[in-house]
Amino acid sequence: GYLSDNYRQLIEADRYPACYRLIPALPKLLLHSWLSRLQTERFEQKTDKIMQLLGRHRKDWEHVFFIILARNFGFGTNSDAFEFWAETIPLQAVNKHRDSLFQIEAFFFGQAGLLQEVPADEYTDRLMKEYTYLSHKFGLRPSANSRWKLLRMRPDNFPHVRIAQLASFYYRSQGLLSALMEAQSLKSLRDMLRCGTSEYWLTHYVFGEASPPHPKTLSNQTIDLLVINTVIPFLYAYGKYKTDNILIQRANGLLEEMRPENNFIVRIWKECGLEAAHAGDSQALIQLKKNYCDIKKCLYCRIGYEYLKKPQCGGQ
């Protein structure tokens, strides 16, 4: 019958999304409620990850926030490497030297295994000496620098630049997590995440190779991605942890106040007739792709379910 024809058509389709023909015909209310459900599902999935990390790090919210923030500084290509690196950063030790950006850089670059590189220069040598001293003092061992990827990457995304930005960010933002949690507006959140680098990085993308001066500040788009993927999920997770519905509502409200992300997933759904109205929708569409479309869970998807019921879908 047409049910099995429709199902086979969905499962065997090599186009994404397989149900694209049906979307313009579906009621807006159905699509809206499904996206809303997916937005919550995505929050819950991110909350699970935060809770797992909290279990591993003895309920240290600041450290777990740092790990998630660092992961999102990897922007896909280096996400796993950044998460692994952030787990090795002894934040309690770093906090004792928080008034020195130079020492924070020594901790961060040393633990990343990036100070063993050549060619070196005077600044790298000073960082290396400082890291040697700090690593003896706190019993540290660097991670392998082979984890970091630089190939086919824009220089602004090089791990060196991102670590320099994280160091600068950490240096100037004491009590960061509580400040972010209490931020009253999207603008104040964005302002807190604005960060540059120390002077050396104005003329470098990697150690020892000078380049024309170029400020390494985070772009507005990058800041928004960090708000969407780090700050807002943390608000939500903390709200769940404290059973504080106001925080949960604030997380949802902030997400719905932001423009949708501009990525190929969002663009493809727009072409099919489903346009993301805000960042909550774009997060929902990412959830839909990764947790339904990619693994052919069409039977569990509201759109897939509607597709199966339509006699005219099969064989079109």
Where are these regions (language model features)?
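Short, well-ordered strand-loop elements centered on a beta-strand within folded domains, enriched
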Residues: 1, 79-84, 312-315
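Intrinsically disordered, low-complexity regions enriched in small/polar residues
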Residues: 4, 172, 207-209, 294, ...
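Acidic, carboxylate-rich catalytic segments that either coordinate divalent cations
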Residues: 271-315
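A surface-exposed, charged beta-strand/loop segment in the N-terminal or early-internal portion
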Residues: 1-31, 316
